Amino acid sequence: MDHPREKEADRPVRSSKVPQGRSGHSRPSSSSASSGVLMVGPNFRVGKKIGCGNFGELKLGKNLYTNEYVAIKLEPVKSRAPQLHLEYRFYKTLGSADGLPQVFYFGPCGKYNAMVLELLGPSLEDLFDLCDRTFSLKTVLMIAIQLISRMEYVHSKNLIYRDVKPENFLIGRQGNKKEHIIHIIDFGLAKEYIDPETKKHIPYREHKSLTGTARYMSINTHLGKEQSRRDDLEALGHMFMYFLRGSLPWQGLKADTLKERYQKIGDTKRNTPIEVLCENFPEEMATYLRYVRRLDFFEKPDYDYLRNLFTELFDRKGYAFDYSYDWVGRQIPTPVGTVHVDSGASAITRESHAHRDRPSQHQPLRNQVVSSTNGELNADDPLAAHSNAPITAQAEVEVVDEAKCCCFFKRKRKKNTPRHK
């Protein structure tokens, strides 16, 4: 998961006290038996590598008490830009809500900090590839309605996300009751926009380093302006158009240096009229982008207005909110094979969806986390492929345009030609 990173000094203040997870966390945090089996906490066995990113590595794990597979996120204790502890703290802040999977454990594991995560299904980027890199309007609207609510909930907890990209939104595992829900993952770049001490909005600043993924980030982020709630929503709008078009006009730009490339991306975004970007698609897509780009730095977005833009369009088109996404009925690769997504999967009524996708302000606090793994696992135990390869810490500040992720698909690079429905 490569993305531009802000300077460490600009990160929210980290607590020096390592938070404890669930039951049993006061016991030894890690162990290595004579057989060479690596353990995290008292009951999580570490297996093969299934992903990687700026934080370090993602490993397959198994809860030896319940026999359930999990994901284990490992970050070197001596990382140049540590984020795992901060991410864990943000998940405690977020608590329990729809589309926020669980964290089962956080603590030291030898030379690493470890967070044990819930396994989820494939990312929207994986599914986009599976669907020949274009989504129907119905699928995009079902995604958009959910993600506006996800972002509203995150913002309600005084956090901004700052890492919008398709790789960071995952469906649930097949066969799970949450398999049709779009989950938001990876809060390593999140930031408190309300100062926890003063309870005031962070000040407007300029000359900030880029944070996020250049393909989707807001125009103001390219200009070096401090991010706020408006920027998360603008980045979502760019992602929605990416799904509808198949690509964005600022993809594939060439330059001699990374700095020049990001400058070109930002310039192209500014110079591409919204009407051109959204040409041949419903006016609501352009209305959404115009609204979020006009928001003031301190302004609270009208999430209901944005949601209603898309729900009214959805109704006008005569769609049913049955979670029949474009990928339903296709074979979805997993770490151990393929899973057929049943087109007759349990449908949820529009009314229940509408109720569920409104963020709850009274959710009980519960440790949560996300997994950037994709797919599900069967009864075969792949943990024997455990690797002790060292983790290389990433640079403190990294700027990368291409939305990279660790997935179970072999990506095919395609020409960036817009696709229209």
Curated annotation (Swiss-Prot):
Ubl conjugation in keyword set: no
InterPro entries found in the cross-reference section: Casein_kinase-1_gamma_C (IPR022247), CK1_Ser-Thr_kinase (IPR050235), Kinase-like_dom_sf (IPR011009), Prot_kinase_dom (IPR000719), Protein_kinase_ATP_BS (IPR017441), Ser/Thr_kinase_AS (IPR008271)
Biased composition annotated in UniProt, kind: Low complexity: 21-36
GO cellular component labels: cytoplasm; nucleus; plasma membrane
Catalysed reaction equations from the record: L-seryl-[protein] + ATP = O-phospho-L-seryl-[protein] + ADP + H(+); L-threonyl-[protein] + ATP = O-phospho-L-threonyl-[protein] + ADP + H(+)
Keywords assigned: ATP-binding, Cytoplasm, Kinase, Nucleotide-binding, Serine/threonine-protein kinase, Transferase, Wnt signaling pathway
Top-tier EC class: transferase
Molecular functions per Gene Ontology: ATP binding; protein serine kinase activity; protein serine/threonine kinase activity
Disordered, as annotated region: 1-36
Keyword Secreted appears in the UniProt entry: no
Post-translational modification: Autophosphorylated.
Family: Belongs to the protein kinase superfamily. CK1 Ser/Thr protein kinase family. Casein kinase I subfamily.
Job description of the protein: Casein kinases are operationally defined by their preferential utilization of acidic proteins such as caseins as substrates. It can phosphorylate a large number of proteins. Participates in Wnt signaling.
Descriptive protein name: Casein kinase I isoform gamma-1
Gene that encodes it: csnk1g1
